[in-house]
């Protein structure tokens, strides 16, 4: 039986945080806390979770943190993940314009099909340690990589991350990933008003010069300082308006489960994506669940509760029992988030402790 929630959304994407430790102290993310709050698990436990979930229809696994490259043994973990083969799933929903989901008119449930493709394994990293690990990770079976990078000016980058000389390490990591063939290679930038919105056009130039996809992300209320306010959000429409001052953009058709609106420059050189969960929610076609570094399932970034999968394993649950537990959790997946609404309740964990 494949995973789908009560709104008909097929769950095919899994994010696993393998640590909530990070060697960066980005000012919008952490307020001085450098250590892990929840700890992490042996890789064999994450591997078992992934194996059970792949048997339920997961086709994409993204490793996150914290900073996942801090974990010794991450290359071998990727190698073991790459041995898994997804079952495949045909989604059974379409997205309405208001961000909610409805069942397909002529399809009542998700239909399995034979999938011979390998598991799609991705990694989100700050890139500081990527230069030396890009090729080993590619050789182990990593498919693609996303680098978090909030400025292309070295001095601004150092002020944001509170790490001196970090920019050069990250740029070297991006270039090493490109040489290794980790593709598509994406660079994510969280935009905050009064902080780094002046980096929009420089990032457009960076995309063209470095041959990467730059994705701007609207600032979400997931930071440790709880300083988020609607006024801090640089919206999709504003990003497009500013980028148009540099060069015209042409929208690229995208899949319904993609989080980003995608654009390329008019001459075809350089790609920009915009992830706009605040101004343009995409909850109606969400296909994701997350596992935190301490082994708990989260069905939404903004969940106010966790579901302890690792506790089931500690109690000696069989794979069949884990499948039943996972299915019961997915059935409770939220329809949408409530950012900006009067009844919004902040997530029970901040982003670094959920997994970016």
Where on the chain are the PLM-derived regions?
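Canonical Radical SAM [4Fe-4S] cluster-binding loop centered on the CxxxCxxC motif
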Residues: 6-45, 55-56, 301
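Radical SAM/AdoMet-radical enzyme domain recognition
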Residues: 43, 47-62, 71-98, 109-215
């Amino acid at each position: 039986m494949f995973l789908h929630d009560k709104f008909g959304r097929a769950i095919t994407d899994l994010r696993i945080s393998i640590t909530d430790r990070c060697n960066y102290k980005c000012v919008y993310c952490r307020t001085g806390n450098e250590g892990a709050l929840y700890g992490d698990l042996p890789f064999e436990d994450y591997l078992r979770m992934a194996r059970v979930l792949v048997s339920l229809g997961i086709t994409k696994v993204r490793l996150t943190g914290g900073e996942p490259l801090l974990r010794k043994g991450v290359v071998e973990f990727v190698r073991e993940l790459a041995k898994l083969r997804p079952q495949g799933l045909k989604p059974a929903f379409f997205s309405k314009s208001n961000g909610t989901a409805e069942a397909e008119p002529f399809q009542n449930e998700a239909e399995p099909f034979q999938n011979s493709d390998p598991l799609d394994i991705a990694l989100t990293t700050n890139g500081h340690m990527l230069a030396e690990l890009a090729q080993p990770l590619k050789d182990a079976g990593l498919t693609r990589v996303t680098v978090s990078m909030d400025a292309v000016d070295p001095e601004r980058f150092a002020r944001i991350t509170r790490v001196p000389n970090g920019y050069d390490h990250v740029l070297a990591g991006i270039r090493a990933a490109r040489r290794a063939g980790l593709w598509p290679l994406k660079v994510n930038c969280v935009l905050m008003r009064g902080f780094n919105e002046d980096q929009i056009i420089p990032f457009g130039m960076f995309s063209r010069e470095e041959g990467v996809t730059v994705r701007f992300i609207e600032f979400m209320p997931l930071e440790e300082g709880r300083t988020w306010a609607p006024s801090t959000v640089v919206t999709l429409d504003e990003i497009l308006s500013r980028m148009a001052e540099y060069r015209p953009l042409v929208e690229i058709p995208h899949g319904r489960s993609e989080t980003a609106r995608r654009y390329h420059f008019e001459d075809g050189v350089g790609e920009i994506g915009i992830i706009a969960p605040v101004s343009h929610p995409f909850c109606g076609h969400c296909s994701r669940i997350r596992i935190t570094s301490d082994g708990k399932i989260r069905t939404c970034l903004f969940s106010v509760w966790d579901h302890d999968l690792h506790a089931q394993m500690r109690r000696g649950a069989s794979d069949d029992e884990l499948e039943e537990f996972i299915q019961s959790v997915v059935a409770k997946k939220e329809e949408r988030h409530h950012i900006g609404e009067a009844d919004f309740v902040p997530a029970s964990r901040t982003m670094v402790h959920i997994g970016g």
